[in-house]
């Protein structure tokens, strides 16, 4: 299994959550503050089977298309392995 931990700006969190749940991913959201994107961020947690990783990442790519080098960072994604017990 895999887990995505995504740190997104508050104004983007609802759109990303809605898109993920529309693709049948389950998402937990946590309001957070910290070093990556500073204030006004939401942490999204999403766990799924290994074969769905590409689909999940495609959702994020669709929500955050690549912009110019000077654009503001809107999302940080971490992909972790999850041990089943």
Outline where the language-model segments fall.
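Positively charged, small/polar-rich N-terminal and surface patches that mediate targeting and assembly
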Residues: 1-85
């Amino acid at each position: 299994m895999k887990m995505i931990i995504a740190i997104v700006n508050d104004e983007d969190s609802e759109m990303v959550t809605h898109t993920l749940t529309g693709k049948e991913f389950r998402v937990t959201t946590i309001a957070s503050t910290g070093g990556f994107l500073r204030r006004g961020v939401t942490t999204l947690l999403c766990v799924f089977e290994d074969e769905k990783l590409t689909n999940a990442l495609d959702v994020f790519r669709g929500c955050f298309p690549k912009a110019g080098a000077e654009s503001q960072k809107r999302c940080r994604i971490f992909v972790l392995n999850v041990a089943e017990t």
